[in-house]
Amino acid sequence: MKRWILILAGLALALAASAQETILDRLKAANTFDTMQLSFVQTRHSALLTKDLVSEGQMVLASPDRIRWEVLKPYPSVFVSSGELTPSGRRFRMPTEKDFTATTLEGEDLTVKLVPVRRDLKSLFREIIVHADKQSLQIRSALLITPDGDWTQLEFKDFVVNRPVDAKLFEKE
């Protein structure tokens, strides 16, 4: 799950590279920030479970590599990363537009289907479908589908961009 959170933080870059050149610049501008705070609802579906798991929380991002992912309910938990090494001892590399092939889909929102190119990402995802608001171009939701068909839907709201963030939020408790 922790890798998924870090990968999500890089989705703005992948989404930005997914469309035509005029959209590309607008998406990059809309999803470039020094800090971002938002609320999320996460729905996880697994063939092994009889019922989907739904959780709610908040995420705080600060450029270039700080993230706080806090689940508030039903089971409170906090994940904090400030550019640390992965368990394998290597620095995590944020995905970029070169790590996915992208297809723009028709619909009410700007919808982009991302298919991973890197082997390590292919082991995590079959595809990622990202929805962005056509006006603001902010990412509103992401559907992450695993190779076995399980999925996680993330819905984002209450965006606050480029406001000061307390550095203590990124300290491990």
Go through the PLM ranges and name each one.
Residues 92, 96-173:
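Gly/Pro-enriched, hydrophobic low-complexity segments
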Residues 54-98, 152, 158:
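An acidic-aromatic
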Residues 7-14:
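Bacterial N-terminal signal peptides
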Residues 1-4:
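Positively charged n-region of N-terminal signal peptides that target proteins for export
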Residues 35, 66, 107-111:
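A generic structural signal for beta-strand entry/edge sites
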Residues 15, 19-52, 171-172:
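N-terminal leader/targeting segments and the immediate start of mature chains
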Residues 41-45, 64-66, 72-75, 82-86, ...:
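Solvent-exposed coil/turn segments that connect beta secondary-structure elements
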Residues 49-59, 104-106, 116:
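A short, surface-exposed loop/turn module that caps and links secondary-structure elements
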